[in-house]
UniProtKB/Swiss-Prot annotation:
Pfam families: HepT-like. InterPro entries: HepT-like (IPR008201), HepT_RNase_toxin (IPR051813). The active site is at R76, H81. The keyword Phosphoprotein applies. GO terms for molecular function: nucleotide binding; RNA nuclease activity. Keywords: Hydrolase, Nuclease, Nucleotide-binding, Phosphoprotein, Toxin-antitoxin system. Modified by cognate antitoxin MJ0126; probably at least 2 successive AMPylation events occur on Tyr-83. PANTHER family: RNASE MJ1380-RELATED (PTHR34139:SF1), UPF0331 PROTEIN MJ0127 (PTHR34139). Belongs to the HepT RNase toxin family. GO terms for cellular component: toxin-antitoxin complex. This is Putative RNase MJ0125. The lineage of its organism: Archaea, Methanobacteriati, Methanobacteriota, Methanomada group, Methanococci. It comes from Methanocaldococcus jannaschii (strain ATCC 43067 / DSM 2661 / JAL-1 / JCM 10045 / NBRC 100440). The modification O-di-AMP-tyrosine is found at Y83.
Length: 116
């Protein structure tokens, strides 16, 4: 399998962030918590984002210290390994309030890389 470059991982992150935003659009917490399919889809997207973030090289992570790379990766680990202890309120708040803001930062990384 050919090695993927950093931009491929960044585009994966953006794609899954778009999915999260679209899945939770026009939805409140009560609807989210009662919609098993959306809950599971958002969790899966966060897992993939967390895995892709781990592929971002250290020099890029250091160049953008305000982006919560470590937290995104850590959330992935918690979601993968705590099957019965998922904090759905944290998942919701991350999906609804943090992902749209963080997405802008990942878009900036791609823009910066493409301008090189």
């Amino acid at each position: 399998m050919p090695k993927r470059d950093i931009k491929a991982f960044l585009y994966d992150i953006l794609s899954y962030m778009d999915d999260i935003i679209n899945f939770t659009k026009d939805m409140d917490y009560e609807e989210f918590i009662n919609n098993k399919a959306i809950k599971y889809a958002v969790i899966r997207c966060l897992e993939v984002i967390g895995e892709a973030v781990k592929k971002i090289p250290k020099d890029i992570r250091e160049k953008y210290p305000h982006i919560p790379f470590k937290e995104l990766a850590g959330m992935r680990d918690k979601l993968i390994h705590q099957y019965f202890g998922v904090d759905y309120l944290t998942v919701w708040e991350t999906a609804k309030y943090e992902i749209p803001e963080i997405k802008k930062e990942f878009e900036k990384i791609i823009k910066d890389l493409e301008e090189k």
